[in-house]
């Protein structure tokens, strides 16, 4: 396939990427001058991978695709490349675990090929051991190892400046799609637009059906466009989800496709329905939460359970209320707080009655659980732990710190400290488990969690 033919075919399959298609075709698929290495970068959902795969499918060029998210170490990375180019598994495992052995085996394998091969390193910036040295070694590999029939393609999400250094490599940038481009792509890639009636016959012309799809795309962009953040895949998933519901009145024969006003009115009704909002906000039914929690066992030590409850209280209670909740009286009993039982637990907002000095304005009190968890210092966590645990569970402070580290490794509490801690700084954490999970732990400890939560 000639170069201009490849460009034309790519433009028919990949929309709104004319500049990137032209650069990619000239740098990679021009047989007279192919670059040894090239960088494609841009945020997610910008057609980097899709354009590459489409170009390889149309040109029938040999390519080796390595996703760096599936590689754990550099040795595993070398091993996967060698296996893809035809090196024996045992030889690759024994000799290809370092850079010198990898280059030797790769050179031997590529010398047996009389055709050009493209090595695609997808999401290399997500590789745990990615570094400037590794990037430099790979970028100069075709030249240093004298492998003229090899080109390396780096696909990144972030800017390649931190990896390039002083290297001179061709870079192709994939910007985020604009609103007009996303709508253009959606309108050029419609789903099946045959509006079949109940008898199975198509009763409308193709132009009318396409017009309905274009109106639908514009309508949903006005509703979900801001939330999708110019992400084509996110917006397309929304389109595919609500499309059957949108055309249901047309299929049932209740509305003509040209009656856009009535279609939009019905669409607004189901977009704001309880079922739709619940699905959009990922709200789980309380019964499903209970069944999910009952099916899970809490395999934590007694100290870890008390620490997790303490972390939850420290995240959702203001520090000024610690003395009220966790101080001891003369009888060595925790004061706690006698809370009034709320009849409707689903109410999150309660208005304060108006007074004469409020000038007609009403304040709104928001629950701490609604505002979300807040960071706390580790000293405050330990103080609450010693206040709520019984004397039997009060172990040494060193063991408590070990259990805190365990909870942090399990991602049940997350570090909230900014930057590098200085010698006098106190580590800060934030709880990362749900209220339902902590309630189950508190029930296993016979601890009245709700009595120690601020309203």
Curated annotation (Swiss-Prot):
Cellular component, GO annotation: chromatin; DNA replication preinitiation complex; nuclear origin of replication recognition complex; nuclear pre-replicative complex; nuclear replication fork; nucleus
Binding positions (ATP): 42-49
InterPro entries assigned: AAA_16, ORC5, ORC5_C, ORC5_lid, P-loop_NTPase
Keyword field: ATP-binding, DNA replication, Nucleotide-binding, Nucleus
GO molecular function: ATP binding; ATP hydrolysis activity; DNA replication origin binding
One record GO biological process: DNA replication initiation
Compartment list: Nucleus
Superkingdom assignment: Eukaryota
Pfam families linked: AAA_16, ORC5_C, ORC5_lid
Known partners and oligomeric status: ORC is composed of six subunits. ORC interacts with cdc18, recruiting it to the ars1 origin of replication.
Function text: Component of the origin recognition complex (ORC) that binds origins of replication. It has a role in both chromosomal replication and mating type transcriptional silencing. ORC binds to multiple sites within the ars1 origin of DNA replication in an ATP-independent manner.
Membership in a protein family: Belongs to the ORC5 family.
Entry protein name: Origin recognition complex subunit 5
Species lineage: Eukaryota, Fungi, Dikarya, Ascomycota, Taphrinomycotina
Protein encoded by which gene: orc5
């Amino acid at each position: 396939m000639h170069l201009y033919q490849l460009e034309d075919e790519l433009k028919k399959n990949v929309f709104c990427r004319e500049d990137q298609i032209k650069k990619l075709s000239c740098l990679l698929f021009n047989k007279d001058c192919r670059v040894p290495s090239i960088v494609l970068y841009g945020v997610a959902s910008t057609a980097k991978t899709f354009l590459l795969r489409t170009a390889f499918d149309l040109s029938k060029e040999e390519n080796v695709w390595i996703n760096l998210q599936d590689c754990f170490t550099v040795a595993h990375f070398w091993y996967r490349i060698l296996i893809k180019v035809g090196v024996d598994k045992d030889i690759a495992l024994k000799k290809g675990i370092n850079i010198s052995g990898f280059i030797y085996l790769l050179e031997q394998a590529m010398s047996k090929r009389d055709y050009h091969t493209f090595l695609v390193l997808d999401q290399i910036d997500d590789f745990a051991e990615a570094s400037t040295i590794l990037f430099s070694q790979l970028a100069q590999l075709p030249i240093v190892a004298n492998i003229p029939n090899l080109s390396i393609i780096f696909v990144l999400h972030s800017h390649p400046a931190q990896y390039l250094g002083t290297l001179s490599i061709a870079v192709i940038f994939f910007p985020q799609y604009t609103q007009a481009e996303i709508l253009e792509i959606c309108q050029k890639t419609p789903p099946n637009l045959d509006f079949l009636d109940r008898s199975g016959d198509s009763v409308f012309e193709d132009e009318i059906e396409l017009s309905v799809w274009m109106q639908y795309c514009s309508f949903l962009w006005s509703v979900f466009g801001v939330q999708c953040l110019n992400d084509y895949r996110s917006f397309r998933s929304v389109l595919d989800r609500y499309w059957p519901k949108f055309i249901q009145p047309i299929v049932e024969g209740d509305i003509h496709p040209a009656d856009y006003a009535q279609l939009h009115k019905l669409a607004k009704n189901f977009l704001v329905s309880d079922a739709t909002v619940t699905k959009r906000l990922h709200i789980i039914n309380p019964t499903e939460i209970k069944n999910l929690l009952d099916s899970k066992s809490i395999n934590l030590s007694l100290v870890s359970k008390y620490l997790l409850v303490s972390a939850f209280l420290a995240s959702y209670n203001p520090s000024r209320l610690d003395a009220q909740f966790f101080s001891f009286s003369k009888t060595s009993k925790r004061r706690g707080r006698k809370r009034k039982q709320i009849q409707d637990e689903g109410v999150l907002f309660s208005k304060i009655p108006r007074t004469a000095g409020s000038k007609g304005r009403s304040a709104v009190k928001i629950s701490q659980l609604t505002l979300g968890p807040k960071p706390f210092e580790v000293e405050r966590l330990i103080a609450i732990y010693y206040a709520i645990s019984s004397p039997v569970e009060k172990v040494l402070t060193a063991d408590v710190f070990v259990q805190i580290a365990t909870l942090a490794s399990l991602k049940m509490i997350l570090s909230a400290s900014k930057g590098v801690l200085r010698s006098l700084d106190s580590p800060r954490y934030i709880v990362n488990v749900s209220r339902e999970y902590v309630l189950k732990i508190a029930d296993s400890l016979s601890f009245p969690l709700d009595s120690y939560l601020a309203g």
